[in-house]
Amino acid sequence: MPRLEDWEIKKYWEIFQGLDPVNKKLTGDKVAPVLKNSRLQDDQLAKIWELSDIDSDGKLDFEEFCITMRLIFDMVNGVSTAIPKELPSWLIPSSKAHLIQANNAVRSNSNQGFDYEDDEDGLSDDFDWYISPTDKATYETIYNSNSDSYGRVKFESLNSLYSSLSKVPKSDISSAWNLVNPKSFETIDKDQVLVFLHILNQRENGKRIPRGVPASLRATFSKEVPNYDLNSVQAKPQPSVGTGRKSFANDYLNKIGQANTITERGTDFSSTEGTDWEEVRLRRELTDLENLLHKIQNGNKNDNSNTNDDSALLKYEYEQLLKYKQNKLSSANLSTKSKDLTEVKGDLDLIQSQVSTLEDFLKSKSSELEKLNEEIRSLKA
């Protein structure tokens, strides 16, 4: 079959826009008239929808809508005699290829080590989001061994790791990936990889995969405003407690020759510099310093000894530290605003590009219309 041509995509864009999409997506109700007009059988239309709705959100974005229209036209025009069982590679949008691969991994019946039915009855609900320094070092080793030159990791690049997990079914691997990748990108960054591996680690040790992630993580993964509630339980990491559980991905680390590179060390926050996480951390440190300063001030009021000079000096040092942290937080806020402006500029450039495309299309249609009018006038003459 021929690939999608530019003129064909422009035609689908006209139809898509005419159906009044909301947030760049069409619901089933809005697409239904187009589907019914094809006069295909209901089971055929249901199969087309299933193939087109790649991210399974019950809606169609423009790429998914193009798939729907092409499958319908191929059936109506006799190019195809049956709905394909799966999308041909030429019809899969590059931005969604990773979703197809993830879904196929869940459905396939390969002989890999993680292919078995999930025993939900034996799982516990005490999932712990805290990442210990040792676990973090393990996750970073795996990340460094699989990330590309841009620091990104694809779902399929960790296939060897998945096969080494004896207690994690494929469906849970896919669920964990979707949790850290709510925007359904083809690749994920370091923060997302570390949390993804942590979820797999917890599942390997008998913890049920959670239905969602903490607000602060969700904001980071979705590039939204993080949760700054310092009293939130999610904002306070739980202390590491020895559970006697086995080390994560030992066999996999041995396989890639990285088993001896993991050592116990303190938590390294350098990777969060310039991110939303750094701002959360600075706010937390500011609160701790303010509380400590408040205690010192109260202590001075109740202390009748001759240690006022020492207390005054200590108070001055903490005030200077507090001022430094406040300045650093202000710098982090400015950096965040600058990043937001960059994203807005990118959106504007994209919109401008779309407008230019539509203007070119309008000009071509206007030219065609003018030619038709000239032919009509010549015939009348």
From Swiss-Prot:
Gene Ontology CC: one annotated term: plasma membrane
SMART domains according to UniProt: EFh, EH
Location relative to the cell: Cell membrane; Endosome membrane; Cytoplasm, Cytoskeleton, Actin patch
SUPFAM superfamilies per the UniProt record, alphabetical: EF-hand
Residues reported in the UniProt entry to bind Ca(2+): D53, D55, D57, K59, E64
Keywords: Actin-binding, Calcium, Cell membrane, Coiled coil, Cytoplasm, Cytoskeleton, Endocytosis, Endosome, Membrane, Metal-binding, Repeat
Subunit structure as annotated in this protein's UniProt entry: Component of the PAN1 actin cytoskeleton-regulatory complex.
Free-text function comment from the UniProt entry: Component of the PAN1 actin cytoskeleton-regulatory complex required for the internalization of endosomes during actin-coupled endocytosis. The complex links the site of endocytosis to the cell membrane-associated actin cytoskeleton. Mediates uptake of external molecules and vacuolar degradation of plasma membrane proteins. Plays a role in the proper organization of the cell membrane-associated actin cytoskeleton and promotes its destabilization.
Name of the protein in question: Actin cytoskeleton-regulatory complex protein END3
Organism annotation: Scheffersomyces stipitis (strain ATCC 58785 / CBS 6054 / NBRC 10063 / NRRL Y-11545) (Yeast)
Gene label: END3
